[in-house]
Amino acid sequence: MGASEAKQSLQKTSEAFMGKINSQDFNEFSKIWASLSAESNDGSIVDEWFDTCLDACLLSSRNNTYKYLYKVSNFYGEFTLNGGVWKKTGSSKGMLRFNFNDKEGTPCTITLTTSGKETQIHHESFDGYDEYDYNYGTGEYQKDTYQNYYMLPENISLTLTKSGKERMTVVVNSKVSTSGEINLTKDEVEVTTTATVGDYKISVGKAAFKKGNEVQAAATISKGGETLIAMSAEGKGSINEKADNISVGQVTANMSVLDGKATVKVAVSDGDLLSKALDNAYNNDENEKSFRNYIATANSLINAKLYLDGKNDYAANIYLSPVEKKDYYYSYWDAEPFLEFGDGSKFSYADFFTEKSFNTAIDMFERLVSDLEVMFQ
């Protein structure tokens, strides 16, 4: 496929993609948000409740060491907005609920629930920074240490209903294999998330971390059952227990738009070697020969392709190309992503995806952003 044909295909796909997303799809939610913001004048009861729940998370405070265990299930209760004031109207364990009416007087409810097994997790990276206070009695600084533990529920569900009908849901399911103190070299974490907002659905399937040597993630964004974007990534490597020594090996990543109308596939054979090659290149950015050699090494580690219109043969090869840049007093070398098409033509990313060539899709995107800003301001 030549560059001209590829550009036409991408123009068509980008416009079709933007045409699938309409700001009016979110009009209902903007009205609900506007009602909630305008009517909620006094949330002092909620603030006091939250502080009480937060205080309940403190397990111990000995020898200036404060140990907290944060549990979603600790934050339960039911609140109703009436006359601009939030009032506590219920207290059922395992559920947090907020009731209010929108501008039309339609009852709306936001509910947070948890279920399933709870797993206690802790890692030193969760802990807060040590604080030092001067003790005038002893003339010395006193160190306060904060340790943060979390109780991770197996299932978390957040729901927005209007007139009893679900309009938005977020469901998070997690599976953790740990003894409590997270060991990044041994433990496994797997999380799946599904969020539904009107006709839109975002699914993150099996975002997984496996025994310090493998990371996986996959996600899709769809509307009315049609997949708008699909993404996946997988990486292999190693990590030590403190996460201060990370090695990256093979990495693959794919992104597809409108069921394969446009797809980018990237494979890196060795992440560490790629990082080293790029570091070396930019440490020699005033030496053309050295810079080119290191970028050539980087390209040998990358296999990146652009596929169009659902075809098995790639439309363009994606690679890094050395480009000379000139400043006021000196010149240096930089690497920019380039596309090489079937007709032999080569374009930098910036030269191919110009505002002029994709002005229709860009205008559609800017209008969408502007409309959403007005809706949710």
Provide a role label for each language-model segment.
Residues 90-91, 99, 109-114, 168-175, ...:
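Short amphipathic beta-strand/extended segments with alternating polar/hydrophobic composition
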Residues 165, 225-226, 344:
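Detector for glycine-centered tight turns/loop "hinges" at secondary-structure junctions
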